[in-house]
UniProtKB/Swiss-Prot annotation:
Coiled-coil intervals: none
Keyword hit for Cytoplasm: yes
Record family assignment: Belongs to the RRM elav family.
Matches recorded under SMART domains: RRM
Protein name from the UniProt record: ELAV-like protein 1
Location(s) in or outside the cell: Cytoplasm; Cytoplasm, Cell cortex
Length: 326
């Protein structure tokens, strides 16, 4: 179950009798589950309230579910609380649907957007394809300006597929360049786990060719560089507190930590970089790791850098999973 609420949804019916389970979107990031329950209890008796959190990092995903004992209370909650302004958010309240395969993996990554487009502009652009569960436009923390990148989660995967078919390669109003629309990176992709497992249990790999520094494109930050000159194996920790660990494969022999800082720094906060080196030669074995604090910034980096050519190498970039430790 990808969204963590299947147990609460299995018995929900589509008719009026079962319209007691509500989905609440666009919740403030710091809102707690108790606060969610308290808000909706002001309308009527609440059977259960669940704030959906990331299973690994533990942070709120910005939506939750409230199940009333009485369908009339649920209807009144929609009429009363839908559109309520909480902090900087305007929440959306509607009847939830039963869990099914059709709602899995409906999260889109959009890049190349005009920097002037707001979150509402992006939603209005994609709204014709279906119900939007939540959205986010990434902004530069220093300037507050849009990075031209957004994430949109649709209600159904089929809606997301329609959006991709219609808008990938499309030029939105006010833009001279086409945008990229594709499914956001999934940190649990089986093929990623298989490749990483193979790398971690295989002999040292050798890759030739120089790494060309592209200083005009990337920002370099030497702070916190963790040199791996004496590492002989892979043992990179990943936990909710340490952030999101990204695996980079097919680096050249001369790749160093500075290159990784330069590549990933523009996408968000990087807390650690590691280049895995051969114990005897101190050359890069062909892969490394980057840890970022924010999932969506990490996903943006993956979407942008996977397939990127560094020197004469084409990089493979994806989330490292917990199963990769074994």
């Amino acid at each position: 179950m990808s969204n963590g609420y299947g147990d609460h949804m299995d018995d929900v019916c589509r008719d009026d009798i079962g319209r007691t389970n509500l989905i609440v979107n666009y919740l403030p990031q710091n809102m707690t589950q108790d606060e969610l329950r308290s808000l909706f209890s002001s309308i009527g008796e609440v059977e259960s309230a669940k704030l959906i959190r990331d299973k690994v990092a533990g942070h709120s995903l910005g939506y939750g579910f409230v199940n009333y004992l009485n369908a009339k209370d649920a209807e009144r909650a929609i009429n009363t609380l839908n559109g309520l302004r909480l902090q900087s958010k305007t929440i959306k309240v509607s009847v939830a649907r039963p869990s099914s395969e059709s709602i899995k993996d409906a999260n889109l990554y959009i890049s190349g957007l005009p920097r002037t487009m707001t979150q509402k502009d992006v939603e209005d652009m994609f709204l014709p394809f279906g119900r939007i569960i939540n959205s986010r436009v990434l902004v530069d923390q220093a300037t507050g300006l849009s990075r031209g990148v957004a994430f949109i989660r649709f209600d159904k995967r089929s809606e997301a597929e329609e959006a991709i078919a219609s808008f990938n390669g499309h030029k939105p109003p006010g833009s001279s360049e086409p945008i990229t629309v594709k499914f956001a990176a999934n940190p649990n992709q089986n093929k990623n786990m298989a490749l990483l497992s193979q790398l971690c249990h295989s002999p040292a790999r050798r890759f030739g060719g120089p790494v060309h520094h592209q200083a005009q494109r990337f920002r370099f930050s030497p702070m916190g560089v963790d040199h791996m000159s004496s590492i002989s194996g892979v043992n990179v920790a990943s936990s909710a507190s340490s952030g999101w660990c990204i695996f980079i494969y097919n680096l050249g022999q001369d790749a160093d930590e500075g290159i990784l800082w330069q590549m990933f720094g523009p996408f968000g906060a990087v807390t650690n970089v590691k280049v895995i080196r051969d114990f005897n030669t101190n050359k890069c074995k062909g892969f490394g790791f980057v840890t970022m604090t924010n999932y969506e910034e990490a996903a943006m980096a993956i979407a942008s850098l996977n397939g990127y050519r560094l020197g004469d190498k084409t990089l493979q970039v994806f989330f490292k999973t917990s199963k990769s430790h074994k």
